[in-house]
């Protein structure tokens, strides 16, 4: 039988504007999945409050809903308009227009939920990706190349890459020493950085960027979009995103995304990272033909987080984490490159973030350490102008 090719196309319309009239399966056979327990005071807006014609997945936060859209996009190799009408690009209300693909998606979510409830006690063991693997048509027949060919290389980003209970303390000690040592890091309390941001929402063109960071865990990123700034804030407790590329004028982060914002803020002042997790595992991985030591942190209420350290230099290469959603886990990969000395601290000048909704690159050009930053920089951002 002819096999349909697996789709690996760029998805420039994904992150900010994917909206399905499917919604959360809260009303279907009782979803069971762990939500993060990160402290939070701001109530996130739910998908059915923000969007029209949400029939399933009701009651889940907007940021989780967008992660669900990312799961669909990654699993099928789809862009927004593969399921939604083309008029939805630039017109959010049109995402609610019914299409055959939306009806199929609702049925598939119900089917997968039934399998997980009946066979796995509600755990998200079967997901869209389990069958589709990047193709819109699942393959039924076995692939003989997999049976008789050379086994594929282990996935360095797999959750199960870390199998040892060995303490990660030597890895973190070497890392902290490699970036300046604990004494210098203790005196590194803030920075203001400028540079460029490149992503799907900029049309892959670099635009100006500002970062304000304060120890131990406050961070604001401002992307200077042509029409209006895109702002991401974590104030130490709450997190928000506001920008012209977003589906809602202001998104309050929740659960795994809130924890991810906290972790991102802490990575600039990493002496407390090891204490952030309840348990640790360790392992090894190969990335681009180079060996890395892996420390996997496990925090109650969250999926594991993998930290990849260069065995020779001790520097951190990658952080891999997963957001649990109503339809299963979605990955987020952050790669760190171009370490440079700034006042005795080895800082990352290039950060590449890859997730199911897109890919972005931050290139820093200047970092000013230990400068005063007014508290207002970490306040809840002003909502963006509503899109039509």
Where are these regions (language model features)?
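N-terminal cleavable signal peptides for secretion/export
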Residues: 58, 149-208, 383-388
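Mature N-terminal segment immediately following signal peptide/propeptide cleavage
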Residues: 44-85, 168-195
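N-terminal mature ectodomain segment of secretory-pathway/periplasmic proteins
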Residues: 176-247, 275-283
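Gly/Pro-enriched, hydrophobic low-complexity segments
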Residues: 224-228, 288-385
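The canonical Cys-X-X-Cys-His
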Residues: 77-87, 125-136
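Gly/Gly-Pro-rich "capping" loops immediately C-terminal to redox-active cysteine motifs
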Residues: 59, 88-114, 140-154
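Bacterial N-terminal signal peptides
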Residues: 12-30
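Acidic/charged, solvent-exposed loop-and-adjacent secondary-structure segments enriched in E/D, K/R, S/T
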Residues: 241-267
